[in-house]
């Protein structure tokens, strides 16, 4: 196990990684997993819930993906940032408050250096979401903001989700990782639905680990079943994600809430 020590001036947690078999895991000073990578396949996605955070691809014609802009609030192990920039060829911006996490991703998780297509910004996700700089410019917004104990979302207010919605283009989508088996999940879902409208919010069934991925569209638009099936096959064949399975475990949250 290797680690980058805590900075006394920031109070941010120690960043370290561990290797178990063929997989490398990112930790923030605890045993909780904050991200992962196959070192011999650094641009693929290892964890199921992180794969599902690419579920927004079902809403988009494949030929349009390369022209879209992605943003991650929370870098983690850089998995989504690497996938969007390297696999999909998207213009990708990641916001991360902890400089040690950025260093760890570059040292241990093969995050490429900044380029015209890839930018890592050291900053506070709440401030970025509230700022006008990126407003209405983001096509897909990944939100995965948990503390070092992974207990509950660090940012989880209606005001924050409203700011996130303002970042999106009219056809944009916010994708959030929540713990579906925790008491906070229902409250988080209620806040997201209040901001985006319940009919524009979709959720995957929880993974075995309890992660539920929620997708919220700025403007509700659902492709026809034939288009969804065609896109799922394209996603599997070209990008190596289990999108056909997604169609069986993804549903509008309004149905589950009885609306």
Which role fits each region the language model picked out?
Residues 127-140, 204, 236-246:
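Short flexible/disordered coil segments
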Residues 1-19, 25, 33-42, 48, ...:
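SAM/dcSAM-binding transferase cores
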Residues 8, 20, 26, 43-170, ...:
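The AdoMet/dcAdoMet-binding core of the Class I SAM-like
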Residues 31-35, 146-149, 174:
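A short, flexible beta-alpha/helix-coil linker loop
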Residues 158-223:
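C-terminal substrate-binding/active-site "lid" region of AdoMet-derived donor-dependent transferases
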Residues 31, 125, 206-208:
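Residues that form or immediately flank small-molecule/cofactor binding pockets and catalytic motifs
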Residues 89-91, 115-117, 171, 198-200, ...:
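A generic structural signal for alpha->beta connector loops
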């Amino acid at each position: 196990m290797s680690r980058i020590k805590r900075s006394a001036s920031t109070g941010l947690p120690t960043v370290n990684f561990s290797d178990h078999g063929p997989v490398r895991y990112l930790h923030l000073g605890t045993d909780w997993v904050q991200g992962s990578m196959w070192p011999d396949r650094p641009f693929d996605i290892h964890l199921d819930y992180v794969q599902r955070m690419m579920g927004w691809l079902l809403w988009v014609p494949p030929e349009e993906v390369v022209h879209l802009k992605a943003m991650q609030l929370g870098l983690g192990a850089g998995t989504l940032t690497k996938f969007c920039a390297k696999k999909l060829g998207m213009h990708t911006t990641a916001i991360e408050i902890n400089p040690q996490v950025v260093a760890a991703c570059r040292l241990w998780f093969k995050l490429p250096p900044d380029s015209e297509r890839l930018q890592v910004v050291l900053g506070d996700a709440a401030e970025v979401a509230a700022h006008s700089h990126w407003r209405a410019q983001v096509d897909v917004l990944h939100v995965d903001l948990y503390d070092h104990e992974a207990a509950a979302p660090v940012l989880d207010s209606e005001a924050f989700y409203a700011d996130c919605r303002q970042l999106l283009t009219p056809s944009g989508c916010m994708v959030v990782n929540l713990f579906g088996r925790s008491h906070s999940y229902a409250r988080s879902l209620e806040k997201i639905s209040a901001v985006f409208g319940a009919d524009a919010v979709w959720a995957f069934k929880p993974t075995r680990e309890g992660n539920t991925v929620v997708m919220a569209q700025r403007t509700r638009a659902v492709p026809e079943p034939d288009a969804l099936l065609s896109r799922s096959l394209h996603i599997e064949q070209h990008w190596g994600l289990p999108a056909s399975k997604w169609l069986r475990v993804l549903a509008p949250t309004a149905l589950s809430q009885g609306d």
